[in-house]
């Protein structure tokens, strides 16, 4: 029997002019409910593109993006609820002051200028905190507008 469950996720983008923000908010609630149901059985790790820069530290130009998909107040509040319900941002737990990104627009030479967003996460059930050995964001790996993220757990 497995001791933890892993879920990969792509969180819906709220899109230009926030056309899908309402849908995104409903999706967030349903996804959190799903995760909490899984957690009844065993601890959960979920990872992927959460399409939110959780804090000003997680985005290069916070003020200019406050009304843009991925950095709205509503999206950041939903991320905060995930944490309030017992899930931990593994990277931020280990590196609370590190500014690094996992996504850069293909426009405006954003990657070359490191004008990015941290959108990709490994979130873990609180009960797994002590098992986290490291969490990494591989900014050196190219090939996509996102870079890989990694979670190392003690077994």
Q: Where on the chain are the PLM-derived regions?
A:
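Surface polyanion/phosphate-binding segment centered on an Asp-His-Pro turn
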Residues: 136-155
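Metal-dependent phosphoesterases centered on the DNase I-like endonuclease/exonuclease/phosphatase
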Residues: 27-115, 119
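Short, structured patches in soluble enzyme cores that scaffold and shape functional sites
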Residues: 8-11, 48
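Short, well-ordered beta-strand micro-motif
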Residues: 10, 122-124, 150-154
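Short helix-loop capping/hinge motifs at secondary-structure junctions, enriched
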Residues: 129-131
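Short, solvent-exposed loop/turn segments at secondary-structure boundaries
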Residues: 18-23
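Conserved small/polar residues in nucleotide/adenosyl-binding loops
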Residues: 1-5
């Amino acid at each position: 029997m497995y001791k933890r469950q892993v879920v990969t996720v792509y969180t819906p983008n709220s899109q230009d002019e926030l056309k899908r923000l309402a849908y995104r908010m409903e999706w967030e609630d349903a996804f959190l409910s799903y995760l909490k149901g899984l957690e009844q059985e065993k601890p959960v790790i979920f990872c992927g593109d959460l399409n939110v820069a959780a804090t000003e530290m997680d985005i290069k130009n916070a003020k200019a993006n406050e009304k843009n998909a991925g950095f709205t107040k509503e999206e950041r509040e939903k991320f905060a609820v995930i944490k309030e319900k017992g899930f931990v941002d593994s990277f931020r737990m280990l590196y609370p002051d590190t500014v690094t990104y996992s996504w850069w627009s293909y426009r405006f030479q954003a990657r070359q200028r490191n004008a990015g967003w941290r959108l990709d996460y490994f979130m873990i059930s609180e009960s797994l905190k002590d098992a986290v050995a490291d969490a990494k964001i591989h900014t050196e790996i190219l090939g996509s507008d996102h870079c890989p993220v990694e979670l190392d757990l003690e077994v």
